[in-house]
């Protein structure tokens, strides 16, 4: 959520930056006018309340003097009616202001590239070289079916499209991957957390999913619970409404959880395979940091995600998202894209973002500065470390062999009982 004071005091710069994200300047002018109207009404309300207090004192004095106070009483009743009307207008305007400020995206950082969509993202670097195959390669969904480790047909029967069963060494591979990821993040100082897989609406508001992206979620009927779209939601809301001792910052959390997404607007996209599912596992990283440290923490978080891909020896690239492709809450985002041979392209496997104080303001997560003792909004960061299903897809395709088998990356073998190869026979 944006700071209305910042918009008020630095209107032109904020309008220019939000225009890069597709926000019409008229929207901000309407917001500014509404804010001005609110402040004028507030002044009138406070003045009327002061007059009412004066009238009340005059009535009390008149009664003590046994004098007629009917005129003062009439004045006070008139003032009370005026105050009631002013306060009703303030409540209405506050609601309109909240709608404005909670639906505006975050302000992009100064170094975020200007662009309309993903075609204008900027590649930063690449790691590893895509493998050259001397045989006809298979897509991961065909490999999974041929090896009898992934079953989409029965997933569709039991639930519906975009669901599947992992089985046998497929299930063990998935488990090996996320255990490896969690162990690697723990080495970097992250505290492992097992969060709730359902959260309330306040939590969804805190991280920016609600109200704007409500259609992308799965809500439970007849209660306030929502299935989490990412562990970012419960992890970030862990400190919602709290004041943290500044000496404790930065704080690192990591968690593996299922993620549930309706994929509204994705009809026809990635209908086969593990790239786009309604339910998938993801290892998440979340950080709470002081404002002056947050961009250094973003670089470190991105490096933590890269570390996983490097140890798995999966080729990838890092891109900086442009203004038109960033998520709603982000001020700056790096995407990691892993090489998927059957598609002959890189696909997103991690997204690491600094939201600055955008989520912290919505969730009221603050810290007490140990130097000046003041309570301030902190910065929150989040990143995938990594999407587990997409990692399975990348391993199956990059490590496939001519005989239809798949070699297990060396770093995962201790997590899967020493198994080196998944073959049709195994």
Curated annotation (Swiss-Prot):
Write down the SUPFAM superfamilies for this protein, in alphabetical order.
Class II aaRS and biotin synthetases (SSF55681), tRNA-binding arm (SSF46589)
Which CDD domains does its entry note? SerRS_core
Task: Specify the superkingdom.
Answer: Bacteria
- Which InterPro entries does this chain map to? aa-tRNA-synt_IIb, aa-tRNA-synth_II, aa-tRNA-synth_II/BPL/LPL, Ser-tRNA-ligase_type_1, Ser-tRNA-synth_1_N, SerRS_1_N_sf, SerRS_core, tRNA-bd_arm
Matching entries from PROSITE patterns are given as:
AA_TRNA_LIGASE_II (PS50862)
UniProt GO molecular function: ATP binding; catalytic activity, acting on a protein; serine-tRNA ligase activity; transferase activity
Q: What is its EC number?
A: 6.1.1.11
Q: Name one GO cellular component term.
A: cytoplasm
Catalysed transformations (reactions) = tRNA(Ser) + L-serine + ATP = L-seryl-tRNA(Ser) + AMP + diphosphate + H(+); tRNA(Sec) + L-serine + ATP = L-seryl-tRNA(Sec) + AMP + diphosphate + H(+)
* Biological process (GO), any one: seryl-tRNA aminoacylation
Q: What is its main location?
A: cytoplasm
Complexes and interactors: Homodimer. The tRNA molecule binds across the dimer.
Q: What does this protein do?
A: Catalyzes the attachment of serine to tRNA(Ser). Is also able to aminoacylate tRNA(Sec) with serine, to form the misacylated tRNA L-seryl-tRNA(Sec), which will be further converted into selenocysteinyl-tRNA(Sec).
Entry similarity comment: Belongs to the class-II aminoacyl-tRNA synthetase family. Type-1 seryl-tRNA synthetase subfamily.
Q: What is known of its domains?
A: Consists of two distinct domains, a catalytic core and a N-terminal extension that is involved in tRNA binding.
What is this protein identified as? Serine--tRNA ligase
The protein's organism comes out as Streptococcus mutans serotype c (strain ATCC 700610 / UA159)
């Amino acid at each position: 959520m944006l700071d209305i004071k910042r918009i008020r005091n630095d209107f032109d710069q904020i309008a220019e930056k939000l225009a890069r994200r597709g926000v019409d300047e008229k929207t901000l002018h309407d917001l500014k006018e509404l804010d001005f109207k609110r402040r004028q009404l507030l002044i009138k309300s406070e003045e009327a309340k002061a007059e009412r207090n004066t009238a009340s004192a005059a009535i009390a004095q008149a009664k003590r003097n046994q004098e007629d106070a009917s005129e003062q009483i009439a004045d006070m009743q008139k003032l009370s009616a005026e105050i009631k009307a002013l306060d009703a207008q303030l409540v209405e305007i506050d609601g309109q202001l909240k709608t404005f400020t909670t639906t505006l995206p975050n302000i992009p950082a100064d170094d975020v590239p200007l662009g309309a969509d993903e075609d204008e993202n900027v590649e930063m670097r690449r790691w590893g070289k895509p493998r050259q195959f001397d045989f006809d390669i298979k897509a991961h969904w065909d490999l999974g079916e041929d090896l009898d480790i992934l079953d989409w047909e029965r997933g569709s029967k039991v639930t519906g499209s975009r669901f599947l069963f992992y089985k046998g060494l497929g299930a063990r591979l998935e488990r090996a991957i996320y255990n490896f990821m969690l162990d690697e993040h723990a080495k970097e100082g992250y505290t492992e957390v097992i969060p709730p897989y359902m959260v309330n609406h306040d939590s969804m508001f805190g991280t920016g999913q609600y109200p704007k992206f409500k259609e992308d979620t799965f809500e439970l009927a007849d209660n306030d619970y929502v299935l989490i779209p990412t562990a970012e939601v419960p992890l970030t809301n862990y400190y919602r409404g709290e004041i943290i001792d500044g000496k404790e910052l930065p704080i690192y959390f990591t968690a593996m959880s299922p993620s549930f997404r309706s994929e509204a607007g994705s009809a026809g996209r990635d209908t086969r395979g593990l790239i786009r599912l309604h339910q998938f596992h993801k290892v998440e990283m979340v950080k709470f940091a002081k404002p002056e440290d947050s961009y250094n923490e973003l670089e470190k978080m991105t490096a933590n995600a890269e570390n996983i891909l490097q140890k798995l020896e999966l080729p990838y690239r890092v891109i900086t998202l442009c203004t038109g492709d960033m998520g709603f809450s982000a001020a700056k985002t790096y995407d990691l894209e892993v090489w998927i041979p059957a598609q002959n392209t890189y696909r997103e496997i991690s997204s690491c973002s600094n939201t600055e104080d955008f989520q912290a303001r919505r969730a009221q997560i603050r810290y007490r500065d140990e130097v000046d003792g003041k309570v301030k909004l902190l910065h929150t960061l989040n990143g995938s470390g990594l999407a587990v299903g997409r990692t399975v897809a990348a391993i199956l395709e990059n490590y496939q062999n001519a005989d239809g088998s798949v070699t297990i990356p060396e770093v995962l073998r201790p997590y899967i009982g020493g198994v080196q190869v998944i073959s049709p026979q195994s």
